[in-house]
């Protein structure tokens, strides 16, 4: 049993927002480590830098948040796992099955496929449409 966190959840862990308290509470009950892919790490980095561009975060705050992410990976809170090539075939299968009814976005499909290929059973997200997709694919969304 393991969990997978998408970017909406990860950003809320490292950048104060309306979901930060909920993210922290979920982490207290989560079975560690939480799975993270290089794709997820990239998306998290870009989300923080986008907030810098929009002047929602200072450069020093982004640097501090990125240092916390690295520390949490080093401390084993998150386990960085590479994406196998099979994730893309799984994502195509999910897209064919779910997108016509749910209107799923490509990166949402890729996150859910990643969680499934990595054998996660719990999916942490604050994105409602992604949560619907994850639940439809049998993942538990707290």
Give the residues covered by each predicted segment.
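Short, well-structured N-terminal submotif of metal-dependent ribonuclease cores
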Residues: 1-43, 47, 51-64, 137-140
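Short acidic/polar alpha-helix capping motifs at helix-coil junctions
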Residues: 12-14, 34-39, 74-79, 93-98
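A general structural signal for well-ordered secondary-structure junctions
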Residues: 20, 32-33, 75-79, 101, ...
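A generic local structural motif
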Residues: 20-22, 67, 109-112
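Short glycine-enriched loop/turn motifs at secondary-structure junctions
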Residues: 27-29, 73-75, 117-118
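Conserved beta-strand termini and adjacent loop/short-helix elements that scaffold enzyme active sites
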Residues: 37, 81-83, 142
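Active-site-proximal, substrate-binding regions of enzyme catalytic domains
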Residues: 45-96, 136
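Active-site neighborhoods of divalent-metal-dependent phosphate/nucleic-acid chemistry enzymes
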Residues: 77-132
């Amino acid at each position: 049993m393991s969990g997978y966190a998408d970017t909406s959840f990860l950003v809320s862990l490292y950048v104060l927002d309306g979901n930060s308290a909920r993210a922290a509470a979920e982490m207290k009950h989560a079975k560690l480590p939480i799975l993270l892919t290089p794709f997820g790490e990239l998306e998290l980095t870009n989300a923080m830098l986008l907030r810098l561009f929009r002047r929602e975060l200072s450069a020093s705050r982004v640097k501090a948040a990125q240092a916390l992410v690295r520390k949490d990976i080093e401390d084993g809170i998150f386990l960085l796992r590479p994406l196998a090539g099979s994730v893309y075939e799984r994502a195509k299968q999910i897209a064919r099955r779910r997108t016509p009814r749910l209107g799923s976005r490509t990166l949402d499909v890729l996150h859910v496929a990643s969680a499934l290929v990595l054998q996660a059973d719990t999916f942490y997200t604050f994105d409602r449409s992604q949560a619907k997709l994850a639940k439809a694919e049998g993942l538990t969304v707290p």
